[in-house]
Amino acid sequence: KSFNFKYNFIKLYGGKNKYGQAIYSNYKIIDEGEIEFPNSSNNVIFADIVKGKDTMRVYSMHLQSIKISTDIHEKIDEEKSKFIFKRLSEAFTVQQQQAELIKKHFEDCKFSKIICGDLNNSAFSYVYRTIKGDMKDAFEQAGTGFGKSYNYKYYPARIDYVFVEENIEVKEFKSIETFQQ
């Protein structure tokens, strides 16, 4: 579905139950591609979009999930604690590898970049710092409140981000509140 945009790049996977990512634009897409992660259903897609005389690369990414339920109970015993720690350690290792692949791809890009995606990690993480680099966090530029994008039972978490180059002005940022886990 094009959602009334003139151009799109859609990358779908799966058989009967499809999943994937898409980039929609009112401006012409002149190139597109994907960064595939080894042994993962997660990935990054990108599109080079022309507006006037400027070309920018837009990335959409979905990194490894940490697989923690939003319904965390107050009482966690030692066994459950070890299980959660193991799951986090495994996910963070995979995310680190994914972030480093993405960073390498950024280095070869000659256009200004806009990066959008689900990092499945906090703004205090290695993954966030690696992918953000010297770019601006759009929420920090123009957002308000917690900016939550994942609604844990006892606290909000921001795991989805938009980063832009210094030469791109962030005029507005809205967090969509209708999505619930």
What function would you assign to each model-found segment?
Residues 2-5, 75-77, 131-134:
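Glycine-rich, phosphate-binding/catalytic loops in enzymes
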Residues 2-69, 162, 169, 174-177:
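Structured beta-strand-rich core segments of catalytic domains in phosphoester-bond hydrolases
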Residues 12-16, 39, 87-94, 119-123, ...:
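Extracytoplasmic/periplasmic, Sec-exported soluble proteins
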Residues 63, 118-119:
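Active-site metal-binding loops of divalent metal-dependent hydrolases
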Residues 69-73, 126-128:
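Short aromatic-enriched loop/helix-cap "lid" or pocket-rim segments at secondary-structure transitions
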Residues 72-88:
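A solvent-exposed, charged loop/short amphipathic helix patch at secondary-structure junctions
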Residues 86-111:
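A long, amphipathic alpha-helix that forms part
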Residues 104-113, 119-181:
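Metal-dependent phosphoester-hydrolase catalytic domains
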